[in-house]
Amino acid sequence: MPKPAIKTAAKLAMSSAGKRGKPSTPKSLAKPQTTKPKTASKLKAKHGEQKRLHPRNLHINGYDFPALMASFPKLKAFVRPTPYGALSIDFADPFAVKNLNAALLKHHYGLAFWDIPKGALCPPIPGRVDYLHYLADLLFEGAKVKRAAAIHALDIGTGANGVYAILGHQVYDWQFVASDINPQSLINVQRIIDNNPSLQGHLSLRRQQDDKAVFKGIIQASDRFELTLCNPPFHGSLKEASEGSLRKVRNLQLNRGEQPKATSATLNFGGQAAELWCQGGEKQFLATMIRESQAFAEQCLWFTSLVSKQENLKPCYQALEKLGVDTVKTIEMQQGNKVTRVLAWSFHSQAKRLQWRNQVISGA
């Protein structure tokens, strides 16, 4: 059985972001430069690029708080000047982060309404949309990236926030199926859809009934997806997830010179079980996803997932080699001091991928 071509895409050299304005179409869809050596080793970005986002990311130059507050006045209550004279929020305060997200989604991506229940995971928008920009590059494989309503994507574990499906449609016009094991999460995402006409008819929701399955029970016989995406549960237990969240809050407080303390808001993990942890953690979740992907090889062009722990890549490569996949790529992303990777694999040759994509986009 031939070995898959394992490729690692280096972090891309970044250009300045486009002007802030109506968000439906990214300001720049220029083709980025990539390096693809035939090894699985991680490539280091050049000095000075370590904290950069994707060139098409609207948040590459940080947050424009005056513009965000003008678009979403509720944010004003959480914005404070820093000792350096800039404006910011307390990122250890979940209510501040939630309002920042709502402001970003309204100002840059045209969402009239976005909200999450108390205790639900509140993701950073710049990092989430970065994943989508890299997926667009992956899909177009060096060709000019463009919006395409014919592209169908599957978001595994969408959570109560639904941001991958929301951003994927608003930025690239992709059509989404979003799945989750928690019915309350899906109810909240449906509420977001119902309050945003631009999302209606473009996002459909499916509940995963089996807590040990990923694609099984979600992908139907008539489905064809150009992309699947996922942010797997990171931790292996609720205790581990709670400790990780508290550690993050304490680090934020220490960075501001404050005495570390836990609040009731930061200790509320009730709605986050499926979002933050599962039995076996990220490693087991990825193993299940890879194993199940073989059964849906003819229905999905690219399978992808975030991988937070670098040590989990090696067993993934080994499992993919055993399945005989055609291509494996690893794309490194970095936001601030956090490094994560996109693992992508396809059972189809490059020629077949090109034919598939072109037929979908042309409507053939």
Curated annotation (Swiss-Prot):
Origin: domain of life: Bacteria
Pfam families: Methyltransf_10
Bridged cysteine pairs (disulfide): none
EC number: 2.1.1.181
Coiled-coil regions, chain positions: none
Predominant cellular place of this UniProt entry's protein: cytoplasm
Keyword Transferase: yes
Disordered, as annotated region: 1-52
Functional description taken from the UniProt entry: Specifically methylates the adenine in position 1618 of 23S rRNA.
Family listed: Belongs to the methyltransferase superfamily. METTL16/RlmF family.
Protein's recorded name: Ribosomal RNA large subunit methyltransferase F
Species this chain originates from: Shewanella sp. (strain ANA-3)
Name of the coding gene: rlmF
